[in-house]
Curated annotation (Swiss-Prot):
It comes from Dictyostelium discoideum. It is found in: Membrane. The chain crosses the membrane at residues 37-57. It is a single-pass membrane protein. One of its GO terms (cellular component) is membrane. Its main location: membrane. Keywords: Membrane, Transmembrane, Transmembrane helix. The keyword Transmembrane applies. This is Putative uncharacterized transmembrane protein DDB_G0287865.
Length: 62
């Protein structure tokens, strides 16, 4: 059981060390980067929106 897990970890390590010469690997990396970028933009938008809502809320309270 433990040996199988170790083999899987080793295989993953070897796969990660292979440079992305295949177009699929590059495409996969690009997909991850685009996904992270979109997530970051959405999060940034949510944060800015919440700050502006808070500012408006406190201005209305005065």
């Amino acid at each position: 059981m433990q040996e199988e897990k170790n083999k899987e970890i080793l295989l993953k390590d070897i796969e990660n060390q292979i440079p992305y010469s295949k177009p699929f690997g590059v495409y996969d990396q690009l997909k991850k980067r685009i996904f992270r970028f979109i997530l970051g933009v959405i999060l940034l938008g949510v944060i800015i929106e919440s700050i502006t809502l808070l500012v408006v809320y406190f201005k209305d309270k005065k």
